Design a protein with these regions (language model features):
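A conserved catalytic-core segment of Leloir-type glycosyltransferases
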Residues: 11-56, 74-141, 204, 213-219
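Conserved donor-binding/catalytic core segment of Leloir-type glycosyltransferases
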Residues: 237-258, 264, 280
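Nucleotide-activated donor-binding/catalytic signature segment of Leloir-type glycosyltransferases, i.e.
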Residues: 283, 287, 292-324
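Short alpha-helical segment that forms part of, or immediately flanks, the ligand-binding pocket
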Residues: 323, 346-350, 364-365, 371
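Aromatic "clamp/platform" in nucleotide-sugar-dependent glycosyltransferases that forms part
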Residues: 337
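Short hydrophobic beta-strand element within catalytic cores of glycosyltransferases
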Residues: 354-357, 367
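Conserved acidic donor-binding segment of nucleotide-sugar-dependent glycosyltransferases
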Residues: 369-370, 374-380, 388-393
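A short, well-ordered alpha-helix in the C-terminal region of glycosyltransferases
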Residues: 388, 395-409, 416-422
Length: 441
């Protein structure tokens, strides 16, 4: 077991960008991507960005660290700047009752029957009003505002005569929300000029344009870049992971929807047939998730001091450590009960790891049965697939090749950036059926 904060000291040792700013890291990053996706793709991005030159684009979410949204914005914002957009990232601030309310909203959008009091709703609106006062100089001058998830959604009502276009970006599966909570949230998002969902199946009908933009990973980020063997081995030694024995791993926030206790159950069932099996459960909390520590304690109880269960509560910036842990694993799990897109799946596939994932959300379109991994609906099903892969090394090797090729084709950051640029071109072009772009260099 490793307590919260155990890996704090790893950043300086493993992360050679510890003292660099985002702008330092991203300088001329587009040229670096050409080595991954090719010059033609970069040329398309420059061509799409030409009519957006100088446009003031503001992204608003609820945290700078922890969770997939923050990770995406850390990379998208500097890339948009390099393409000539005036891209800005702001974060709403809140207190414990605010995050309690928005966590309940988040769960309810994904189908949980959450009860939210009128007092808590009123507090949610109060915090949004306070953030409006702070952010008004930025938002009132924006050409495009992209609001991520429920936390800042109520900002819109403070801009009835706004200058720019406002877009609500929903990152979770809203296909079957708890209706009382959705009715409340809908009155805040119905006024947006458009909405973005990660998959068609996630969307709720609105009398506004709906866009589908799956998220992505950055192949050059600290979490996904290739690592030297020596660095991977240092991480392995730090957490006492035996290199001679098989390893399964799940990386995610300590959240009940990620089913970490179910992962432990699957591990124990598989271990009956593979006594040398090891499990890594690595993750942390996000600043806007008040339940993380509580769930971590539940997982500690379930692990019951098993020396082969490596339970790691990592800080939000332990990106290279997570990278190494995924590379150490033979098989990666993401046994979610509810899921948005599931970027931890994308990260694992990019590293050539077969994934055993819950048959929910965006995991369904990433984990192709018998090709990039297996979809499961129970700890027993996960254990069966773990056993299968550990005894079929050729099948694992084929899945490894398929996994990386699948992400390269579909889920890298350059594709995500292209779709955001195309969306903004479409929005500023209004009802025109044909949009002329300047020829890229």
């Amino acid at each position: 077991m490793y307590p919260q904060g155990k890996s704090e000291g790893l950043k300086g040792e493993f992360d050679n960008t510890a003292d660099k700013t985002d702008d330092d890291i991203m300088t001329k990053m587009l040229e670096q991507y050409a080595g991954v996706v090719g010059e033609e793709i970069i040329g398309h991005l420059r061509q799409l960005a030409e009519p957006l030159n100088g446009m003031r684009v503001v992204h608003i979410n609820s945290t700078r660290e922890g969770g997939g949204v923050a990770e995406i914005l850390h990379r998208l914002i500097p890339l948009k700047k390099e393409l000539g957009l005036n891209a800005i990232w702001e974060v709403v601030s809140g207190d414990a009752p605010f995050y309690q309310c928005t966590k309940k909203m988040h769960n309810a959008i994904q189908g949980d029957r959450e009860d939210i009091s009128e007092e808590l709703y009123a507090h949610y609106e109060l915090i949004n009003a306070q953030n409006h006062e702070r952010l008004e100089p930025v938002l009132s001058e924006a050409d495009v505002v992209i609001i991520h998830d429920p936390q800042p959604a109520a900002l819109l009502k403070h801009y009835p005569e706004r200058k720019g276009k406002w877009i609500w970006r929903c990152h979770v599966d809203a296909s079957n929300p708890h209706r009382p909570v959705w009715r409340y949230l809908r009155k805040h998002v119905i006024g947006y000029d458009a909405a973005i969902y990660s998959l068609p199946a996630f969307a709720q009908p609105m009398d506004k344009p709906l866009y589908i933009v799956p998220p992505s990973i950055d192949p050059l980020s600290e979490k996904n870049v290739s690592l030297p063997d020596e660095e991977i081995e240092r991480v392995r030694a730090t957490y006492d992971i035996d290199p001679e024995r098989p390893v399964i791993c799940q990386v995610s926030r300590f959240d009940r929807f990620k089913d970490p206790v179910g992962v432990i159950e699957a591990y124990r069932l598989a271990k009956k047939f593979h006594p040398d099996l090891q499990l890594i459960l690595a993750g942390g909390g996000a600043a806007d998730d008040p339940e993380g520590e509580e769930v971590f304690k539940e997982v500690e109880t379930a692990a019951a001091d098993d020396p082969d269960v490596h339970l790691l509560m990592l800080p939000p910036d332990a990106h290279r450590t997570i990278n190494a842990l995924q590379r150490i694993a033979d098989i990666v799990l993401q046994k979610s009960l509810k899921e948005g897109f599931g970027l931890t799946v994308t990260e694992a596939l990019w590293k050539g790891k077969p994934v055993i994932g819950g048959n929910v959300g965006g995991i369904r379109i990433q984990v192709v049965n018998h090709t990039t991994g297996f979809l499961v609906s129970s700890p027993e099903g996960a254990a069966l697939r773990i056993r299968y892969l550990l005894t079929h090394s050729k099948r694992m090797a084929a899945m490894s090749r398929n996994a990386k090729a699948f992400v390269t084709e579909n889920y890298l950051l350059t594709r995500h950036l292209r779709e955001y640029l195309a969306l903004m071109v479409a929005i500023i072009s209004g009802s025109r059926n044909r949009i002329e772009l300047t020829r890229g260099s």
